[in-house]
Amino acid sequence: MFDKIFWVMKMKKLLLCILSLMLCLNTSVIHAKEPESLMIVAHPDDETIWGGSHLINGNYTVLCITNGNNKKRKKEFMNVMEKTHSKGIILSFPDKTKGKRDNWKSCKKDIQREIQKEIDSKDWDKIVTHNPDGEYGHIHHKKVSKYVTMILEKEDKTNQLVYFGKYASKKNKAELENEKKLSKKDYKEKLDVIQLYSSQSKVMDHLHHMLPYENWKPYSNWGKIE
């Protein structure tokens, strides 16, 4: 009798494992059918804050410029890549040096070379990055946006370039009234991914009002009043 119960329990576990594997494979196949796009961000978490729902529902390679030498941040980033079925590349250019935000003067050309290498590695459907304002003005966001834009303008590929959406501060969030929000389902899925960035809880709290919005803008429409 005991052997029979034990056998039934083992079979149930096996079936659950098979179903789980089939679900993962099915999700991966769906992602693989989407045209492949490239997202380029300054820090681990930027890809999720400004484009998490796109990652979940699309087929992306994400190039992150900083924190590849930070074990915690790198692990969080790679966990997000796994969760969203994305390919992640995380470099180790400086985020902060001696407690202060690095100005990238010493590594500007190296960063540009790495960005160009990834841009030229495939014929991407879209190349997505920080907007020229750096969202809320972060200097690294602005620099990444500038480098990506400069390369794509030089290569005459700006038709592929897409920027993260406009930012509004908490006190000015009324500016977002006419912006389209993510569906409840997509927003919930995005929040589930956000949880993987436990080290960035303060950042997520500060930018929480922006999480329901991912209204990206093509290069050709940036700055136009709609």
Predicted regions and their residues:
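Cleavable N-terminal signal peptides
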Residues: S20, V29-I30
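Bacterial N-terminal signal peptides
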Residues: C17-C24
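General helical structural elements
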Residues: L16-C17, F77
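Short, Lys/Arg-enriched N-terminal segments with co-localized hydrophobic residues
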Residues: M1-K10
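Active-site rim/loop-helix segments in enzyme catalytic domains that contact anionic ligands
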Residues: I30-K122, T149-T158
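Metal-dependent de-N-acetylase/amidase catalytic core
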Residues: A32-S37, G58, C107-E226
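N-terminal Sec-pathway targeting helices
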Residues: K12-L14
